[in-house]
Amino acid sequence: MIYKVLYQKDQIVNPRRETTKTLFLEADNVVAARTMVEDNTPYNIELIQELTGNSLAYEKQNPDFKLTTFKSEDK
């Protein structure tokens, strides 16, 4: 499944909508997606949303859409 993760770059600064970033990743479930991000980044996760159907098709139209992979996934 593909997940959209909304996050802040670090956990020190309070979250602000204006500084929220997005990444997309493939994981078996939302818990696995959260674990991947937490284990490989210092990000403050705001929301993890599963993308399917029209939502996924819409996101794929964005030229910045790309799946993020982490080296620890290669175990």
From Swiss-Prot:
A single GO cellular-component term from the record reads: DNA-directed RNA polymerase complex
Q: Name one GO molecular function term.
A: DNA-directed RNA polymerase activity
**Which UniProt keyword terms apply here?**
DNA-directed RNA polymerase, Nucleotidyltransferase, Transcription, Transferase
Task: Give the enzyme's main class according to its UniProt record, as a single word.
Answer: transferase
Q: What is its EC number?
A: 2.7.7.6
GO biological process entries: DNA-templated transcription
Q: Does the keyword Transferase apply?
A: yes
Provide the catalytic activity annotation.
RNA(n) + a ribonucleoside 5'-triphosphate = RNA(n+1) + diphosphate
Annotated InterPro entries: RpoY
NCBIfam families reported for this sequence: PRK13667.1
Its assembly, as annotated, is:
RNAP is composed of a core of 2 alpha, a beta and a beta' subunit. The core is associated with a delta subunit, and at least one of epsilon or omega. When a sigma factor is associated with the core the holoenzyme is formed, which can initiate transcription.
What family is reported?
A: Belongs to the RNA polymerase subunit epsilon family.
Q: What HAMAP family does this protein map onto?
A: RNApol_bact_RpoY
Role this protein plays: A non-essential component of RNA polymerase (RNAP).
- Name of this protein: DNA-directed RNA polymerase subunit epsilon
Organism, scientific name: Lactobacillus gasseri (strain ATCC 33323 / DSM 20243 / BCRC 14619 / CIP 102991 / JCM 1131 / KCTC 3163 / NCIMB 11718 / NCTC 13722 / AM63)
